[in-house]
Amino acid sequence: MEGGSELLFYVNGRKVTEKNVDPETMLLPYLRKKLRLTGTKYGCGGGGCGACTVMISRYNPITKKIRHYPANACLTPICSLYGAAVTTVEGIGSTKTRIHPVQERIAKCHGTQCGFCTPGMVMSLYTLLRNHPEPTLTQLNDALGGNLCRCTGYRPIINACKTFCKTSGCCQSKENGVCCLDQGMNGLPEFEEGNETSLKLFSEEEFLPLDPTQELIFPPELMTMAEKKTQKTRIFGSDRMTWISPVTLKELLEAKVKYPQAPVVMGNTSVGPDMKFKGIFHPVIISPDRIEELSVVNYTDNGLTLGAAVSLAEVKDILANVTRKLPEEKTQMYHALLKHLETLAGPQIRNMASLGGHIVSRHPDSDLNPLLAVGNCTLNLLSKEGRRQIPLNEQFLRKCPSADLKPEEILISVNIPYSRKWEFVSAFRQAQRQQNALAIVNSGMRVCFGKGDGIIRELSIAYGGVGPTTILANNSCQKLIGRPWNEEMLDAACRLILDEVSLPGSAPGGRVEFKRTLIVSFLFKFYLEVSQILKGMDLVHYPSLASKYESALEDLHSRHYWSTLKYQNADLKQLSQDPIGHPIMHLSGIKHATGEAIYCDDMPVVDRELFLTFVTSSRAHAKIVSIDVSAALSLPGVVDILTGEHLPGINTTFGFLTDADQLLSTDEVSCVGQLVCAVIADSEVQARRAAQQVKIVYQDLEPVILTIEEAIQNKSFFEPERKLEYGNVDEAFKMVDQILEGEIHMGGQEHFYMETQSMLVVPKGEDREIDVYVSAQFPKYIQDITASVLKVSANKVMCHVKRVGGAFGGKVTKTGVLAAITAFAANKHGRPVRCILERGEDILITGGRHPYLGKYKAGFMNDGRILALDMEHYNNAGAFLDESLFVIEMGLLKLENAYKFPNLRCRGWACRTNLPSNTALRGFGFPQAGLITEACITEVAAKCGLPPEKVRMINMYKEIDQTPYKQEINTKNLTQCWKECMATSSYTLRKAAVEKFNSENYWKKKGLAMVPLKYPIGLGSVAAGQAAALVHIYLDGSVLVTHGGIEMGQGVHTKMIQVVSRELRMPLSSIHLRGTSTETIPNTNPSGGSVVADLNGLAVKDACQTLLKRLKPIISKNPKGTWKDWAQAAFNESISLSATGYFRGYESNINWETGEGHPFEYFVYGAACSEVEIDCLTGAHKNIRTDIVMDVGYSINPALDVGQIEGAFIQGMGLYTIEELNYSPQGVLYTRGPNQYKIPAICDIPMELHISFLPPSENSNTLYSSKGLGESGIFLGCSVFFAIHDAIRAARQERGLPGPLRLNSPLTPEKIRMACEDKFTKMIPRDEPGSYVPWSVPI
């Protein structure tokens, strides 16, 4: 076999050649480290987030066409790119050349916050426009289906995309985002006239036109190469792996004979993740992506034959074309396949993955294999011995040797037969999220009847996700043949299939009862579908479907989205150049979109740089018997391995580690994921390989405490207990009409910031100085803990933060620990050290939002007034205290939300468990505490027979009132938000419409709920609220401003420049902000608590006013001068042009002994109304509409403020509905990445989203009367939770099920389905508790 070793491809129009290619190298690190194209980001490494999206272009010499498709660079081996052209975000535009319209519009439509996901979003949209310059809304939504954003809530990204939509015959690109295709989705009036957007967030007239003629051309050299008929097999190799890329079938077969165990790889979407995450290594890879015979598309008399190398995206296009051309009776299978292909993975994976690879991988949760198996599909195989054909049946799917591919065989193509008349095929799936999520259970079902007789002649049913392989219910189907298609058959079928497709209680993946229920629920849906079709074909002989059942056949998937925004106009009295109150674009928006914004890991490699990674504990509670690092140290490139013995203890006054005074554990571990060793090597690859070779011997210890209930049982708490009491609770209980007791459990939440924990530590070489470049929220803490570990004073450690790719509270405490260890390694070896956590490590190590258990006892009157409330709050703190006590305290101080409970008592405990310590996360205890209170109110309403909204209103604060901690409060704006939300959401009208819908539909239900919000702003002490700033004026009249706040996406730097512009009456273009550093602003407080702009803005304002006061004589002498004139004059008179600004903090205190104080400066008020629709058979839900009204004071920047509100709302919606952490009974976290842990995607947002601000209100103590909005909106996500609750209540009420209805959070599809009890949930078998070990435990 001839071989060549040179790899040739193009990147952004430039030729790239590599003579010694390592087949293990993926495109992402090659772009970032070798080509220094850092715009393409690492987000997860598994193709699940889209941050690394690039466009790949290939020329097909047969069709003479160029195919452009999006791909995940993290899964693309560079060896697979021979002859391809890669386009990255840098290749389509930059600030140095010209920006592309896609980049411009995403930035100017305010579609970026932290900006880390933005290059991937840009490239997904760009690729779509290369193929479809005037896309439809459906195409846009599909194109972004593989991209995640944790900040924006997607609305502004969608609005940016809509500006490219077709406009002929449609108003899709109107400025308010409202399209004629989308209006009136629920048949109800929208906003009244006069409620339009008060000013535009962006002006489409400014946008650059999209001109396809200006795009990069496909390199002619690659076209010439592809046309050559004398191509050779190419072999690329390294010490560990060989990559073989044959050109002909003959060469492919030769390679397969020589290396029969080598996998055949097309897109690397299956083999790649297995190698990365499961440690499966293949010394030889065969990649036949240039063989024409594997890409055939043949139409025969019997069906369609598709080549094994055809991508899933191409299969989707082919099937869509076929279904348009052929009669429906022939395309039943193709329609079913298309249904799954709409939601299978994201566009990037669908364009990379091949049909053959998907089939042969035989993943147990494959969406296509169950369908192909029931459709009598066959596989065409080839080997040296010749061709043969095998059925794609259960034996093949189970890898039975007699029905499987032989090691030397390859799959050439797949035959998918046409369907026949009286034959019907359907596809079903239910996942945690509608799109880009593996199915919990999926199914393919096919039935064939005798002509017009309704008697089953053939029946085939297959399920995925319910066993180690796809399972066919062949025995059940055989017993049903010959039976008429009626309800008796259905009942028998359910019982037969439940018996045959059995799941043990300990089945991997858990959710056993839910999966059993889906097995029969899907079967019932199939029965309904076929029954309706039969009725349509023969009105006489088949009974009509009950009208209440018809909606069960409709999909819940959201396809189009629209929104309206109503916010404040800038003050008419202010100067026209004054930017305060205007929707100024994010300072880094364009750089986010071009990939030029520099994050920590984008910094160039420093000379002699090392890489550090961690070895973590695999046990929840154990003694460390021994640590053997010898094998790891012997590997090439390994420099050192640190253990706890090398690092000195740190001063425990840092508080966050409590009694663990070691950064690396030496004697005992208290959770899975605890840091044990740090491996330092010359490269990341070498460090990670070495980490896998460290051997740790453990001796397990008891008890292992994972849950709150176990902590309560073992009295495992951190001290002290906190208590808040108001009024006389015990006496009040004697005076009420009714008393109820209940509890609610709320699961935790992963931060899922897009940029993982990142740091680069550089020793300066003298005086033991060291620079720490880090993605962090609390530079001072990093400075202090690093100085403590290095035993130097703080003035030798400088911490620098340019920007952070998302944080949400997760880059405060744990970042300090990671940075201190990295700094110790850098100091020890006198070399720079970089540490970038992989996504799985990050989630495992850093903890997240605290799971909560809330217990309540409420005493109330029959009219809904709650007179007494006694509550207990428990949070799962994890192994170390971290910020858990503060979270409990904030939860207690905020628990009453918008309500006045005249007699209230609440106690709170932080539970010590054997989990990684949980920490701050947006909302800081309020999302949990508030949900407990709202659950109590909902149950009180049910007991009183009243609507929950009425009970909420009855118990709401009156205008002038007092909180439980005796702080005076004026809630006028709370009442106004509630009333306006009621009005703008048409609540009364829609409530009636929801009730009408529910009365007419049995298997689908709608729910409507409205919740108020009172979110206190303040940090509990004056010291925690101090801030400083430094402003320099240069002689050319330009200004440099620095302050202590961290830019995490919330736009604080943008607001600070607006402040300087107003105070100095200077254009924004003259002001610059470089970043945050302990070198310029010492002793900073952490950025969080919604006060970053408040506090630092007041410090910046103070600095500017100091300068103005100092320069007043100069300016008065030359009032018409410029800043350049004034600066030069001041310099000539030896007047300082630099000033520090300082804000000492809001007056804030709380005395826990008395339960009294003034912990908060002000309150943010709001209300949200959400409507949902649920599928009672599957547990799926659709977010139909949300209306939010917020009191924002006076908005400094409406674009940034509305972005914070809607981003927080979507994150909260995820918290309360789909984001679920799964732990093993041994304390191992399963959900360590986007493939297991689902945050909201574009498919999850409300189809309609309406946000409005109250008119401006005055507050002389805050920055221009503004309010901090970073956290408050997250709680409003629970309006979706209670809307689902309302829908479930309606379903249960119709079924005659008794109350009370108590639902835990998150309200996942599993919880929704199992709460909608019916005949199917009753027929499933249930395992006795204690008779099995569950796959996961609820934490």
Swiss-Prot record:
Binding residues for [2Fe-2S] cluster 2: 114, 117, 149, 151
Subcellular location: Cytoplasm
GO process terms (BP): lipid metabolic process; xenobiotic metabolic process
Segments forming domain FAD-binding PCMH-type: 236-421
Reactions this protein catalyses: an aldehyde + O2 + H2O = a carboxylate + H2O2 + H(+); retinal + O2 + H2O = retinoate + H2O2 + H(+)
Mod. after translation: The N-terminus is blocked.
GO molecular function: 2 iron, 2 sulfur cluster binding; aldehyde oxidase activity; FAD binding; flavin adenine dinucleotide binding; iron ion binding; molybdopterin cofactor binding; NAD binding; protein homodimerization activity
Family note: Belongs to the xanthine dehydrogenase family.
UniProt-listed Enzyme Commission number(s): 1.2.3.1, 1.17.3.-
Residue ranges of every copy of the 2Fe-2S ferredoxin-type domain listed in the record: 5-92
UniProt GO cellular component terms: cytosol
InterPro entries recorded: 2Fe-2S-bd (IPR002888), 2Fe-2S-bd_dom_sf (IPR036884), 2Fe-2S_ferredoxin-like_sf (IPR036010), 2Fe-2S_ferredoxin-type (IPR001041), 2Fe2S_fd_BS (IPR006058), Ald_Oxase/Xan_DH_a/b (IPR000674), Ald_Oxase/Xan_DH_a/b_sf (IPR036856), Ald_Oxase/xanthine_DH-like (IPR016208)
Binding site for Mo-molybdopterin: 113, 151, 807-808, 1048, 1089-1092, 1204, 1269
Active-site residues, as the UniProt record annotates them: 1271 (proton acceptor)
Superkingdom to which the source organism belongs: Eukaryota
Protein name per the record: Aldehyde oxidase 1
Misc: AOX genes evolved from a xanthine oxidoreductase ancestral precursor via a series of gene duplication and suppression/deletion events. Different animal species contain a different complement of AOX genes encoding an equivalent number of AOX isoenzymes. In mammals, the two extremes are represented by certain rodents such as mice and rats, which are endowed with 4 AOX genes, and by humans, whose genome is characterized by a single active gene.
Key words, A-Z: 2Fe-2S, Cytoplasm, FAD, Flavoprotein, Iron, Iron-sulfur, Lipid metabolism, Metal-binding, Molybdenum, Oxidoreductase, Phosphoprotein
Cofactor: [2Fe-2S] cluster; FAD; Mo-molybdopterin
Residue(s) carrying Phosphoserine: 1069
Designated gene of the protein: AOX1
Binding residues annotated for FAD, in chain numbering: 264-271, 345, 354, 358, 367, 411
Taxonomic source organism: Bos taurus
Protein purpose: Oxidase with broad substrate specificity, oxidizing aromatic azaheterocycles, such as N1-methylnicotinamide, N-methylphthalazinium and phthalazine, as well as aldehydes, such as benzaldehyde, retinal, pyridoxal, and vanillin. Plays a key role in the metabolism of xenobiotics and drugs containing aromatic azaheterocyclic substituents. Is probably involved in the regulation of reactive oxygen species homeostasis. May be a prominent source of superoxide generation via the one-electron reduction of molecular oxygen.
